[in-house]
C-alpha cells in the first residue's frame, strides 16, 4: 500500500512539472510557490489528474479563488477550460494583441458582463464639444504616468467603473496642484440626482455632480466600499472642486488626442465585448464592438498615446486591478474611434 501511494505521489509530481511547463509557456502565471504541495488540494481531490486540472488548481491558488462545493469546482473548471481554449485559438490568429489567463478565467462572458460592465445612461456625447485647442506642440507620444499625476490602478469589484474613471481624471488634475486621491464611494452614494445610479453612471454626469455639490471628499476620509450606501459627504473633507466639465466632440479623436497630449488624462468610455476581459498585452482592436453612445458599457481613463509595431494606440488605465492586462493598463487602437473610445470623452477643470 505504501509503495502504491509513493508511486502515485511521484506520478503527480511528474505530471505537474510537465503540465505547468507547457502552461507557463502559453499562459504565464506568477505562482505563489512552485512546490507541488502548494496546489489547492480540494480542487485536485475533485478533478484528480485530468487534463488541465493542475492548470486550474494553480490558477485558483494564484488568484485566491474559493469554491463552496464539488459542483462549483467542476462548473468553474469547465468554464476555465473553455476560456483557455478561446485564449489559445485567439492567440494563434497573430493579432496585434494577445489574451491570457487572469482572474476572470473562471467566469462565463455573461457572468463577467453582468458583474463588471454597465450601460450608458445619458452619455456626454455631443455634436459640438467645448474643448478648446490651445497653442502648443503636440507630443509625438504621451504617458502621463511619467509626470507622476496618474494615481495607482484600483479594482472596482462589482461596482461601477464610472467612479474610478471620474476620480482618475480628478486625481490627475488634483495631483497637478497638490497630490492626493479622491473618494469613489462618495460618487456611488451621493450622485444619483445627476443621472448616476449607485454602481452605474458616467464621468460627465459625475463631474457635474462634483461641480454643483461643492467638491468631492478625499479617499482617506471617505473610503471605497464597492456597494451603494448612505451619502456621508462632509464639506470639511473636500479635496477638490470642479469649476467646469469639458466634453470632447463625439468621435473626434483629434480633440481627444489634443486634450490627452497637452492638458491631462481624460475620462473615456467604450464598449467591452467578449475577449477583452482576457486581454493581456498589445494594441487591442475589434470588428464587433460598437461606436455609438448607447453601445459603451465601461468607463476608463486615457493617460497617453503612442505607436507600437506601426499601430497608433491610446494608453488607457483600467479599474480591474493590477493582475489584469498590462499591470492594469491596456492599449487601444487610435484613429478609428475604436469601440467608441472618443464617443463619450470628458475631463474636469478643477480648483482646490
Swiss-Prot record:
Tissue specificity of this protein: Mainly expressed in pods, but also present in stems, roots, leaves and embryos (at protein level).
E.C. numbers: 4.1.2.66
Localization in the cell: Plastid, Chloroplast
Keyword vocabulary terms for this entry: Chloroplast, Disulfide bond, Glycoprotein, Lyase, Plastid, Transit peptide
Reactions the enzyme catalyzes: (E)-4-coumarate + H2O = 4-hydroxybenzaldehyde + acetate
pH dependence: Optimum pH is 8.
Superkingdom of the source species: Eukaryota
Chief localization: plastid
Subunit structure: Forms homodimers, homotrimers and homotetramers.
Function (record text): Involved in the biosynthesis of vanillin (4-hydroxy-3-methoxy-benzaldehyde) and derivative natural products, key components of vanilla pods flavor. Catalyzes the conversion of (E)-4-coumarate to 4-hydroxybenzaldehyde, a vanillin precursor. Mediates the conversion of ferulic acid to 3-methoxy-4-hydroxybenzaldehyde with a very low efficiency. Cannot use cinnamic, caffeic, sinapic and o-coumaric acids as substrates.
Name of the featured protein: 4-hydroxybenzaldehyde synthase, chloroplastic
Source species: Vanilla planifolia
Amino acid at each position: 500500500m505504501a509503495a502504491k501511494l509513493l508511486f502515485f505521489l511521484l506520478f503527480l509530481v511528474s505530471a505537474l512539472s510537465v503540465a505547468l511547463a507547457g502552461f507557463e509557456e502559453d499562459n504565464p502565471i506568477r505562482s505563489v510557490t512552485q512546490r507541488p504541495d502548494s496546489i489547492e488540494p480540494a480542487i485536485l481531490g475533485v478533478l484528480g489528474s485530468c487534463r488541465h486540472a493542475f492548470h486550474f488548481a494553480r490558477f485558483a491558488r494564484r488568484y485566491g479563488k474559493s469554491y463552496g462545493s464539488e459542483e462549483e469546482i467542476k462548473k468553474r473548471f469547465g468554464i476555465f477550460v473553455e476560456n483557455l481554449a478561446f485564449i489559445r485559438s485567439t492567440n494563434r490568429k497573430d493579432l496585434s494583441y494577445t489574451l491570457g489567463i487572469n482572474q476572470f478565467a473562471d467566469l462565463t462572458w455573461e457572468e463577467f458582463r453582468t458583474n463588471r460592465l454597465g450601460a450608458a445612461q445619458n452619455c456626454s456625447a455631443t455634436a459640438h464639444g467645448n474643448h478648446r485647442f490651445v497653442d502648443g506642440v503636440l507630443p509625438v507620444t504621451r504617458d502621463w504616468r511619467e509626470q507622476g499625476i496618474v494615481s495607482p490602478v484600483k479594482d472596482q469589484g462589482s461596482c461601477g467603473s464610472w467612479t474610478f474613471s471620474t476620480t482618475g481624471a480628478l486625481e490627475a488634475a488634483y495631483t497637478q496642484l497638490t497630490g492626493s486621491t479622491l473618494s469613489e464611494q462618495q460618487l456611488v452614494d451621493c450622485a444619483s440626482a445627476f443621472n448616476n445610479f449607485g454602481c452605474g453612471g458616467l464621468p460627465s454626469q459625475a463631474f457635474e455632480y462634483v461641480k454643483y455639490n461643492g467638491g468631492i471628499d478625499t479617499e482617506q476620509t471617505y473610503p471605497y466600499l464597492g456597494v451603494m450606501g448612505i451619502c456621508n459627504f462632509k464639506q470639511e473633507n473636500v479635496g477638490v472642486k470642479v469649476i467646469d466639465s469639458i466634453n470632447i466632440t463625439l468621435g473626434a479623436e483629434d480633440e481627444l488626442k489634443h486634450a490627452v497630449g497637452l492638458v491631462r488624462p481624460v475620462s473615456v468610455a467604450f464598449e467591452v465585448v467578449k475577449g477583452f476581459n482576457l486581454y493581456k498585452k498589445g494594441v487591442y482592436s475589434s470588428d464587433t464592438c460598437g461606436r455609438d453612445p448607447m453601445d459603451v458599457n465601461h468607463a476608463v481613463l486615457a493617460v497617453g498615446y503612442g505607436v507600437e509595431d506601426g499601430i497608433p494606440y491610446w494608453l488607457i488605465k483600467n479599474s480591474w486591478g493590477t493582475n489584469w492586462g498590462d499591470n492594469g493598463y491596456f492599449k487601444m487602437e487610435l484613429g478609428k474611434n475604436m469601440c467608441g473610445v472618443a464617443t463619450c470623452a470628458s475631463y474636469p477643470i478643477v480648483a482646490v
